[in-house]
């Protein structure tokens, strides 16, 4: 069962059902429960060690069938089906796999009997895949990304409980219309907000600016408030079946002593846009600033984000964005700024229009 704080969801019919003992536990499925589809892409959640307790493992070694069988309690929540989309560590996720996953997810959501989709995914780039799907899917049905920090064979593996909670959320009517979600470590996060914050701690996925969307607790989930960002059915972005790639956008990392070299490298590689992971409020050295200003004058779209990890990059504070023709990323980190810019460049290179997109999405 899922609900928003302060909102009563239970109907008298459901209360009567519970009173008659026909529902054995919170979150248990009704006889008429529809399908929750699990799409597996690989990642640590499907990883295997040579021996339990050893640090090394092979990512994506387990199949979607194994992931489902490891959590027999899922049958009390929903009728679960599985499909293997890929078996990669998420460091190897790319636009080709995103497009394949978008189409597999859309196909599943189009089935009337499917209530929602869970995507098992590595945590390294989970936030990027979630955000891409958040901008391109055209359904109000729940889509939940889930992963693990410990492989499936580890002592105290976190994957099984994460999958259970993800299926609870994906099968919930209350998760409809919220966009793509991430469920990890008993927490629910919106795709536009979430980021990975720790390399090895299961409590790694956080939403540093606006906070988590909700929580899960053994078959029950509670949502706190809806997101204010546009997504899914309210998104202007659309990916046709004939799209095979996305525009090349580079991310350059600012640091003390930064030169124009990484910017020149991005331009030489054919970048249509450049996102700066700037210091502080999206700042950079004078050398980098001059190189990016020159690039913007040639039509390359430049976005200032921040390497800090939280906060807002605003226009015209230390950098005169109006004069230089730059875009301020607002709340988006560099990796999500890159995705939004890639999608924006498929339809426009107008700086004002793209700045509005960074405000809306």
Q: What do the predicted segments below correspond to?
A:
Residues 31-108, 290:
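ATP/NTP phosphate-donor binding region
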Residues 12-24:
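Bacterial N-terminal signal peptides
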Residues 32, 39, 43, 63, ...:
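Accessory alpha-helical/coil subdomains and C-terminal extensions
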Residues 1-15:
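Bacterial N-terminal signal peptides that target proteins for export
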Residues 281-361:
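C-terminal non-catalytic interaction/assembly regions of soluble proteins
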Residues 146-218:
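Internal gly/pro-rich beta-alpha loop/helix module
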Residues 26-30:
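Sec/Tat signal peptide C-region and signal peptidase I cleavage site
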């Amino acid at each position: 069962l899922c609900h928003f704080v302060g909102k009563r969801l239970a109907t008298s019919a459901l209360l009567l059902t519970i009173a008659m003992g026909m529902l054995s536990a919170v979150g248990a499925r009704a006889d008429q429960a529809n399908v929750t589809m699990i799409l597996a892409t690989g990642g640590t959640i499907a990883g295997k060690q040579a021996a339990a307790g050893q640090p090394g493992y092979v990512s994506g070694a387990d199949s979607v069938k194994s992931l489902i069988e490891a959590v027999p309690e899922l049958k009390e929540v929903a009728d679960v089906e599985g499909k293997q989309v890929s078996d990669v560590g998420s460091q190897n996720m790319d636009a080709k796999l995103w497009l394949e996953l978008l189409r597999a997810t859309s196909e599943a959501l189009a089935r009337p009997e499917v209530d929602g989709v869970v995507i098992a995914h590595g945590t390294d780039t989970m936030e990027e895949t979630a955000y891409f799907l958040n901008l391109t899917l055209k359904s109000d049905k729940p889509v939940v990304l889930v992963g693990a920090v410990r492989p499936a064979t580890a002592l105290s593996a976190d994957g099984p409980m994460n999958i259970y909670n993800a299926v609870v959320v994906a099968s919930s009517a209350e998760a409809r219309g919220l966009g793509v979600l991430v469920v990890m470590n008993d927490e629910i996060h919106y795709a536009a907000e979430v980021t990975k914050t720790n390399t090895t701690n299961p409590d790694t996925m956080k939403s540093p600016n606006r906070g988590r969307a909700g929580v899960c607790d053994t078959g029950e989930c509670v949502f706190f408030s809806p997101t204010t960002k546009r997504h899914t059915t309210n998104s202007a972005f659309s990916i046709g079946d004939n799209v095979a790639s996305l525009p090349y956008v580079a991310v350059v990392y600012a640091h003390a002593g930064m030169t124009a070299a990484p910017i020149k490298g991005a331009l030489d590689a054919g970048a249509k846009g450049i996102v700066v992971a700037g210091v502080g409020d999206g700042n950079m050295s004078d050398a980098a600033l001059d190189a990016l200003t020159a690039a913007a004058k040639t039509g390359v779209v430049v976005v200032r984000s921040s390497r800090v990890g939280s906060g807002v990059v605003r226009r015209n504070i230390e950098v005169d964005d109006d004069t230089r023709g730059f875009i301020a990323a607002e709340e988006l980190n560099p990796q999500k700024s890159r995705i939004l810019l890639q999608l924006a460049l498929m339809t426009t290179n107008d700086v004002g229009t793209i700045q509005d997109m960074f405000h809306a999405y």
